Each structure stands twice: as C-alpha cells, then as structure tokens.
Amino acid sequence: MNIGAADMGTGCDTILAQIAAEVLECSTDDISVFGADTDISPYDSGSYASSTTYVTGKAVENCALELRSRIEKFGAKLIGCDKSDVTFDGSCVRCEAGEHNGASVSLCDIATASMCGNDMALSVTNTHTSPISPPPFMVGAAEVEVDLVTGESRVVEYDACVDCGTPVNPNLARVQAEGGILQGIGMAMSENITYSDKGKLYENSFLQYKIPSRMDIGHINVEFESSFENAGPFGAKSIGEVVINTPLPAVTDALSHAAGKPVSYTHLRAHETAANL
C-alpha cells in the first residue's frame, strides 16, 4: 500500500494498514505500507488539520473496496461463474451458487493469473476529499496541587473523555490523547517565550523553555465515548488536535478555584499564581 500520509507519530501507517486489512479480511501482517517518499508517494495534502484518519483513511477504505471487487470479479472469471455468486474471505474466492457451487480459487492463483493478461489489473488508485471534517469532542477535568506560599503548582490528575467516533486503534488513540494533554498542560503552566527590549529571546534553550516530561505530571486517565461517524472510515473521525485544547481552561479553572477568584489563562506562572493567591 503506497500512501502519501506521513506518520509523524500519529500512527497512521498502522491505522491505514488496519483499515485496508479490515476491508480485505486479511492480517495487517499482509499489508506492507510505503509512505512519505516524495519520489514515488501519491499526493497528500498533509498529516495535519485533524484529517489523516478521516480523509486519507476513507481513501484507503474506498481503494481497498475497489480492489476487493476486482479480486472477486477476476476470481469469478477463473471459476466461470457470475461475480454476484462469489464471496471473498481474504484468502480465496468461492462460488456459492449455480453449477459451480463450492468451487474456489486462491488469492495466490488469482494474483498469478492477473499477470498473464492485461484486461484487469489488481492494482487500484483512489483519492478522497472532504470539504468538512466532523469535529471530535472532549471533556477534561484537572486536579491541581498548589503551594499557597510560592505559587508553584502541579497537575496531580487529569481525567479526559474523548469522542473521536469509533477508534480504529484505541491504544494509539489513547497515547496520542495522553501526549496532546501533556503538551497542553506544558503550554498552560511552564512553557513561555519572552524577549528583551532589544529583541533577544530569553528562553533560547530547553533549560529556560521548560517542556514538561511525563515525570512532571501526575496520573492522566483517558477514556473514550464511542460514536459512529457515517462519513468516516468504519465510523472514525479525528483526535489529533482536540486533546490539546482542554488542559488550558481546565487548569485555569482549577487555579481559579484555589484562588477563590477568576485567574486569567495568561497568568499561570508561579509568581503570578502566588500574587493571585
């Protein structure tokens, strides 16, 4: 399977292989994924904007459906029956009706026979686009521990529930959600950029620009409220961006509760929190 999507940690190589394998009723071990080669990869608008699974995944689903149809048609031709009389189980095409009932031909034989003529290639190219991307939804709740003297704060627990349609791969969806939540917490509580009056960047290394590690945050719990998106591949929709949006307001609300008054989301650093407290 040759795809244009780039796996930047989104897990799309695995997820797109799963979609193809589901349609073709085979193991993901039987799907070889070739992606992100600008010499030979097909065009893809990019792995961003919450669109990889929803848009590219749908292209893969449609492509696999067409390939399956061609396999069934070619298998029926070899058996000598109508395409409407055959089924495909991932390994062979079998006739289920008529005078050839019970006859079958293996996928290996179909592949070999398809190379002996040029009337039907078992190779499919498909594109898919969508003017919209159905929004995912998420709710997040933060428990924040605050030092009332210094203003230092730490997220003790963060609970999230995500509606990303039907997760194609729940494990990958969960770790992507955890990573996005951690990034959102860092943007809210520790990451900052300031300049001198001469335009010099103060946070010019990771000693000053403090990205939180997994050790800096308490427990992150992610659950899924599965729905079914009719326009998505097997009911899936996006998850990549929504998970970074909730930590900032959740942490801000927690600190506001601790301070007993509203705290601006732009003032979550320790000295600012201490002043608010």
Please provide the spans of the model-predicted regions.
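Thiamine diphosphate
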Residues: 12-19
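Conserved short loop/turn motifs at secondary-structure junctions
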Residues: 5-6, 61
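Structural motif
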Residues: 1-4, 255
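C-terminal catalytic domains of large/alpha subunits in multi-subunit enzymes
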Residues: 19-269
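Single conserved hydrophobic/aromatic residue that forms the stacking wall/gate
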Residues: 267, 274-277
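Short, well-ordered turn and helix-capping elements at secondary-structure junctions
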Residues: 3-5, 128, 272
